[in-house]
Amino acid sequence: MNGQNIRIRLKAFDHRILDSSTREIVNTAKRTGAQVRGPIPLPTRIEKFTVNRSPHVDKKSREQFEMRTHKRLLDIVDPTPQTVDALMKLDLAAGVDVEIKL
Protein backbone atom coordinates (compact mmCIF):
# COMPACT_ATOMS: atom_id res chain seq x y z
CA MET A 1 0.00 0.00 0.00
CA ASN A 2 2.61 2.52 -1.09
CA GLY A 3 1.81 6.20 -0.80
CA GLN A 4 -1.57 5.63 0.79
CA ASN A 5 -2.78 7.09 4.06
CA ILE A 6 -5.60 6.01 6.33
CA ARG A 7 -7.41 8.87 8.06
CA ILE A 8 -9.41 7.86 11.13
CA ARG A 9 -11.84 10.29 12.75
CA LEU A 10 -13.26 9.38 16.16
CA LYS A 11 -16.24 10.99 17.92
CA ALA A 12 -17.67 10.37 21.39
CA PHE A 13 -19.58 12.10 24.15
CA ASP A 14 -17.14 10.91 26.85
CA HIS A 15 -13.53 12.04 26.35
CA ARG A 16 -12.07 9.25 28.52
CA ILE A 17 -13.54 6.51 26.33
CA LEU A 18 -12.40 8.43 23.26
CA ASP A 19 -8.82 8.72 24.52
CA SER A 20 -8.62 5.02 25.44
CA SER A 21 -9.93 4.01 22.00
CA THR A 22 -7.41 6.33 20.36
CA ARG A 23 -4.61 4.76 22.41
CA GLU A 24 -5.72 1.27 21.30
CA ILE A 25 -5.65 2.27 17.62
CA VAL A 26 -2.22 3.95 17.93
CA ASN A 27 -0.71 0.95 19.74
CA THR A 28 -2.13 -1.49 17.18
CA ALA A 29 -0.83 0.54 14.24
CA LYS A 30 2.65 0.95 15.75
CA ARG A 31 2.84 -2.75 16.62
CA THR A 32 2.28 -3.68 12.96
CA GLY A 33 4.96 -1.30 11.69
CA ALA A 34 2.97 1.70 10.47
CA GLN A 35 3.78 5.31 11.25
CA VAL A 36 1.07 7.23 13.11
CA ARG A 37 0.46 10.98 13.10
CA GLY A 38 -1.74 12.18 15.91
CA PRO A 39 -4.00 11.94 17.80
CA ILE A 40 -4.99 15.48 16.89
CA PRO A 41 -7.76 16.90 19.09
CA LEU A 42 -10.41 18.60 16.98
CA PRO A 43 -12.79 21.27 18.34
CA THR A 44 -15.44 20.02 20.74
CA ARG A 45 -18.99 20.62 19.52
CA ILE A 46 -21.23 21.95 22.29
CA GLU A 47 -24.99 21.80 21.76
CA LYS A 48 -27.03 23.71 24.34
CA PHE A 49 -30.73 23.20 25.01
CA THR A 50 -32.75 25.68 27.09
CA VAL A 51 -36.07 24.54 28.57
CA ASN A 52 -38.60 26.00 30.99
CA ARG A 53 -38.30 24.56 34.49
CA SER A 54 -42.02 24.64 35.05
CA PRO A 55 -44.58 23.33 32.56
CA HIS A 56 -47.03 26.22 33.01
CA VAL A 57 -45.77 29.58 34.32
CA ASP A 58 -42.48 31.31 35.24
CA LYS A 59 -41.01 32.06 31.85
CA LYS A 60 -37.92 33.55 33.51
CA SER A 61 -37.07 30.31 35.28
CA ARG A 62 -35.16 28.18 32.80
CA GLU A 63 -32.70 25.33 32.83
CA GLN A 64 -29.88 24.67 30.38
CA PHE A 65 -28.53 21.31 29.27
CA GLU A 66 -25.55 20.71 27.03
CA MET A 67 -24.23 17.86 24.97
CA ARG A 68 -20.49 17.83 24.17
CA THR A 69 -19.13 15.87 21.21
CA HIS A 70 -15.37 15.31 21.49
CA LYS A 71 -13.40 14.49 18.33
CA ARG A 72 -9.93 13.13 17.51
CA LEU A 73 -8.11 12.68 14.20
CA LEU A 74 -5.47 10.04 13.41
CA ASP A 75 -3.40 9.61 10.25
CA ILE A 76 -1.74 6.27 9.57
CA VAL A 77 1.05 6.76 7.02
CA ASP A 78 2.08 3.90 4.70
CA PRO A 79 0.03 1.14 6.36
CA THR A 80 1.03 -2.46 5.81
CA PRO A 81 -1.56 -5.16 5.02
CA GLN A 82 -1.06 -6.41 8.60
CA THR A 83 -2.01 -2.95 9.88
CA VAL A 84 -5.28 -2.97 7.94
CA ASP A 85 -6.13 -6.49 9.17
CA ALA A 86 -5.34 -5.58 12.78
CA LEU A 87 -7.47 -2.43 12.59
CA MET A 88 -10.41 -4.36 11.12
CA LYS A 89 -10.27 -6.89 13.98
CA LEU A 90 -9.98 -4.20 16.66
CA ASP A 91 -12.97 -4.06 19.02
CA LEU A 92 -13.50 -0.52 20.34
CA ALA A 93 -15.68 0.65 23.21
CA ALA A 94 -19.37 1.28 22.68
CA GLY A 95 -20.18 4.94 22.24
CA VAL A 96 -17.26 5.73 19.92
CA ASP A 97 -18.13 6.64 16.33
CA VAL A 98 -15.37 5.76 13.85
CA GLU A 99 -15.03 7.18 10.32
CA ILE A 100 -12.26 5.76 8.13
CA LYS A 101 -11.10 7.32 4.85
CA LEU A 102 -8.49 5.75 2.59
Curated annotation (Swiss-Prot):
What keywords tag this UniProt record?
Answer: Ribonucleoprotein, Ribosomal protein
Q: Which GO terms describe its cellular component?
A: ribonucleoprotein complex; ribosome
Q: Name one GO biological process term.
A: translation
One MF annotation (Gene Ontology) recorded for this entry: structural constituent of ribosome
Instruction: Report which superkingdom the organism of origin falls in.
Output: Bacteria
Q: Name one Pfam family in it.
A: Ribosomal_S10
Q: What is known about its subunit structure?
A: Part of the 30S ribosomal subunit.
Xref: NCBIfam families:
PRK00596.1 (NF001861), rpsJ_bact (TIGR01049)
The family assignment reads: Belongs to the universal ribosomal protein uS10 family.
Function, in words:
Involved in the binding of tRNA to the ribosomes.
What the entry lists under PANTHER family is as follows: 30S RIBOSOMAL PROTEIN S10 FAMILY MEMBER
Protein's name according to its UniProt entry: Small ribosomal subunit protein uS10
- Name the species this protein comes from: Rhodopseudomonas palustris (strain BisB18)
Gene name of the record: rpsJ
